[in-house]
UniProtKB/Swiss-Prot annotation:
TM segment ranges: 67-83, 95-113, 162-179, 187-203
Alphabetic keyword roster: Antiviral defense, Cell inner membrane, Cell membrane, Cytoplasm, Membrane, Transmembrane, Transmembrane beta strand
Protein name: Gasdermin bGSDM
Superkingdom to which the source organism belongs: Bacteria
């Protein structure tokens, strides 16, 4: 079974995207999928009608100086090689084509470089959701999920178009991947050393892909028994959601654990 061994971003409240890609943005509506979450393919305003306030404006391409040295995710050999191949292809850098044998790798680290954040104001998001009415008649599929607190909305994403990679064998010794990577990436990709044992890959024309996110659980506040004589529906509020993985149904099956110091299965 493939595992995430360590996620440095968890300490900053970020959850992982199983398969980093474009198209993941603040205000995207997610739904519970076993122990993790999946994309509904729609933004939050498709489910909630405008009421007291409009949906918050997305602030894009914000600098993340405190995360530049802390955007590292450590995988076991199989997961690491799979993710490395995925990133190379999504960023149009190249393809492994079996040139790296996962059996020879005990752990592999991906450190995202040139990281930027897109986000929305939590206060504005809370005001929008708490003052809106859901269009449950148009979304029967999500009606019960909304009542059961199984819907989420993204409030922040991290994105990058370059990364570095390092790997170790079963004895804990570093594996030199530079020659192998130089032999498989496209000519336009710059390959160098970010640190002694890390191979850095940069392709300036690559569109950034999202690799981590923050999400808010939408909490349904049921009416109390003494409120049933009042008009109006129950209201909604939001709460930070941690320890989930954003799944792509066409990709790796994932299973997250609540404790950040435990393994996450991918």
């Amino acid at each position: 079974m493939s595992k995430v061994l360590k996620n440095a971003l968890a300490g900053y409240g970020y959850n992982l995207v199983a398969l980093p890609k474009e198209g993941i943005a603040p205000l995207l509506l997610l739904y519970k999928n076993k122990r993790d979450v999946s994309s509904s393919g729609n933004n939050i305003d498709k489910l909630f009608a405008l009421a007291d306030s409009p949906p918050p404006i997305v602030s894009k391409n914000n600098a993340t100086l405190n995360l530049q040295q802390n955007s590292t995710v450590s995988f076991d050999g199989k997961a690491g090689v799979d993710i490395l191949d995925w990133l190379l292809q999504k960023l149009k850098m190249g393809k492994l084509r079996g040139n790296i044998n996962a059996d020879h790798i005990n752990s592999l680290q991906i450190s995202y470089q040139n990281v930027f954040e897109d986000n929305v104001s939590l206060l504005q998001l809370d005001n929008f959701i708490s003052g809106s009415e859901p269009k449950v008649d148009q979304f029967n599929t999500f009606k019960e999920k909304l009542k059961d607190n199984e819907l989420f909305v993204i409030n922040s994403v991290l994105k990058s178009n370059s990364f570095s990679v390092s790997a170790q064998n079963k004895n804990g010794q570093n594996i030199d991947l530079e020659a192998t990577i130089k032999g498989i990436v496209d000519a336009d990709v710059n390959v160098g050393r970010s640190k002694k044992d890390e191979v850095l890959m940069e392709y300036k024309n690559a569109t950034p892909i999202v690799f981590a996110f923050k999400a808010q659980k939408i909490i349904y506040d049921h009416k109390k028994w003494w409120q049933f004589f009042k008009k109006g529906d129950a209201k909604f509020r939001i709460k930070d959601e941690h320890g989930v993985v954003l799944k792509d149904e066409s990709g790796f099956p994932t299973q997250s654990l609540e404790e950040t110091n435990e393994l996450i299965n991918i």
